[in-house]
Amino acid sequence: MPPATGGGLAESELRPRRGRCGPQAARAAGRDVAAEAVARSPKRPAWGSRRFEAVGWWALLALVTLLSFATRFHRLDEPPHICWDETHFGKMGSYYINRTFFFDVHPPLGKMLIGLAGYLSGYDGTFLFQKPGDKYEHHSYMGMRGFCAFLGSWLVPFAYLTVLDLSKSLSAALLTAALLTFDTGCLTLSQYILLDPILMFFIMAAMLSMVKYNSCADRPFSAPWWFWLSLTGVSLAGALGVKFVGLFIILQVGLNTIADLWYLFGDLSLSLVTVGKHLTARVLCLIVLPLALYTATFAVHFMVLSKSGPGDGFFSSAFQARLSGNNLHNASIPEHLAYGSVITVKNLRMAIGYLHSHRHLYPEGIGARQQQVTTYLHKDYNNLWIIKKHNTNSDPLDPSFPVEFVRHGDIIRLEHKETSRNLHSHYHEAPMTRKHYQVTGYGINGTGDSNDFWRIEVVNRKFGNRIKVLRSRIRFIHLVTGCVLGSSGKVLPKWGWEQLEVTCTPYLKETLNSIWNVEDHINPKLPNISLDVLQPSFPEILLESHMVMIRGNSGLKPKDNEFTSKPWHWPINYQGLRFSGVNDTDFRVYLLGNPVVWWLNLLSIALYLLSGSIIAVAMQRGARLPAEVAGLSQVLLRGGGQVLLGWTLHYFPFFLMGRVLYFHHYFPAMLFSSMLTGILWDTLLRLCAWGLASWPLARGIHVAGILSLLLGTAYSFYLFHPLAYGMVGPLAQDPQSPMAGLRWLDSWDF
């Protein structure tokens, strides 16, 4: 077995020797421990020369890296058609190549890297990525798949090095590497154009870097210490820049940093100036550096996506004015709203659209049978309204009348330009939202009643202020009922042309549903200005993009025929995801974890909680443990505790989320549970060997146990590998299927 054993570690020995970091520290700790163990017990084997140890360490690292790359790149070109979410992220890569603006609920880094990989590998961005099953034909897709597989391949060596540093045991690291190499789920996710391998790459890079800079704690401010601390910050920025799930690894690094600083603060051998330097270094590398890099990804994102595209409508009018090809780009319109102006009014909530009306009436039994008022996502003449004073029908555009600007607090009337009916509300209930009032178009040629009067208010402004196009955020308060004009976002039935419901809500709290801005503005009596002067600043568009992403994330709903899942399903491998194909004639790929690996991980979590609790209670009660048992216990509690914390932080928050969830959300947590399995079983087997030291075969318990786990994991991969690499022919329930007998749960659908 490898020399870095993890056995006999006293508490002080968990810290690497001065002047050594990373693999050097791991090997050195292993040699010192091995020497001490041999002195205590003549039955313990010697592990060979230092040169053999170094060669063995590098050979194992090379082996697990080679196996990881080989499994991830094997049959990477199959199937030659779109699989699962490649339709989204491949399309977004095309948008970057074409510089077309789009909207997504995730930060941009992952998609930018996919687009860059496609561009560098010769993909021209012309494939449509319309739906799963569409063949790539002559389009170059292998560069994007290869990039994702490349990053996914590094998960195994990263986990290997992390466990080696935490446990000082090559066998624990090797077992962890085998679990991830032979997991069909991790393999499947790594072979397609997806964000998951990119996200997991940065998560594992952050975890490894954090563990490495911890191991250099006896050489603070040295070059290796700065390198690993800075690399931790870079990796945190990468994880957050791909998905907001990166917040969980940020939390883990933050908790580790707080504990580290607390320990340093209590070290009376350090001056407060030195503690301050430690604090400053961590602020710079773990806060300032990640924030700067994260912000830079958005700067590049906005710079590259400069053309109008399918994402325009999710953003404010001022944001859209930045995009070439948008009707607001380089446009010139009057800056301040005046009576007589023809305007369009856009709701600030994502994907709600413009205030709209048409000649169709509400049907019988749906409030008053008056003209429908809705919101509509697209540009249309029926979005045009004329703003008038509430108490006069005179034409404000008459040259004899002076220009009068609309101000915050004015009482106004909105007349629909195409039908000459006024925006109107009353105490009739809205068509779809209970306790909200109906909004209609009412009157003839602009003549109606007092239910047509609205007070216009600018959010967070004083009375008398003028109203700016694009920039002013306004609300319309109904004068008679006191309700606020808004859109519920609910889709009307076919009688409403499946447009969105407009209501007047009696709840006056400011929400995006009830806040609007003026977009188009026509008034021949006013001078035009270029909208360039009204474009938002970078901090404003950065903030807006995050608000839109957060709202989009929370509002995600499952698509038709889509397999969603619950968090409790995930650790037990309850149900997978179809990546490709359904019928026996299709090329089928099914995302499912290797059940042997996943159920072993689940058992390991339970065993860790039990054994860790027993050890912690014994140590707290002052039990005198033999040196080797004490050292192994420290490895289990400290190293295992680190990865258990990672599993907890990457798993349990999903129970609190209201959005739709999918099986693949568990895979970052699965990486941590696999590392815990490696540390736990290596430690337990060593403890068993120590406890049975008087038995002649005790020396082989650890070796036999690790080999059994390695061989069992490899054999299970042999059985289940068609799930990842693809299968054609009878389904698993057919006795003729190569997967017959392997459908161990009825919920597995392959």
Curated annotation (Swiss-Prot):
Belongs to the glycosyltransferase 39 family. Its main location: endoplasmic reticulum. Pfam families: MIR (PF02815), PMT (PF02366), PMT_4TMC (PF16192). PROSITE patterns: MIR (PS50919). Residues 334-390, 403-459, 464-521 form the MIR domain. It catalyses: a di-trans,poly-cis-dolichyl beta-D-mannosyl phosphate + L-seryl-[protein] = 3-O-(alpha-D-mannosyl)-L-seryl-[protein] + a di-trans,poly-cis-dolichyl phosphate + H(+); a di-trans,poly-cis-dolichyl beta-D-mannosyl phosphate + L-threonyl-[protein] = 3-O-(alpha-D-mannosyl)-L-threonyl-[protein] + a di-trans,poly-cis-dolichyl phosphate + H(+). Slightly activated by Mg(2+) and inhibited by both Ca(+) and Mn(2+). EDTA ha no effect on activity in vitro. It is linked to Muscular dystrophy-dystroglycanopathy congenital with brain and eye anomalies A2: An autosomal recessive disorder characterized by congenital muscular dystrophy associated with cobblestone lissencephaly and other brain anomalies, eye malformations, profound intellectual disability, and death usually in the first years of life. Included diseases are the more severe Walker-Warburg syndrome and the slightly less severe muscle-eye-brain disease. Muscular dystrophy-dystroglycanopathy congenital with impaired intellectual development B2: An autosomal recessive disorder characterized by congenital muscular dystrophy associated with intellectual disability and mild structural brain abnormalities. This is Protein O-mannosyl-transferase 2. It comes from Homo sapiens (Human). GO terms for cellular component: cytosol; endoplasmic reticulum; endoplasmic reticulum membrane; nucleolus; nucleoplasm. N-glycosylated. Pathway: Protein modification; protein glycosylation. Interacts with POMT1. GO terms for molecular function: dolichyl-phosphate-mannose-protein mannosyltransferase activity; mannosyltransferase activity; metal ion binding.
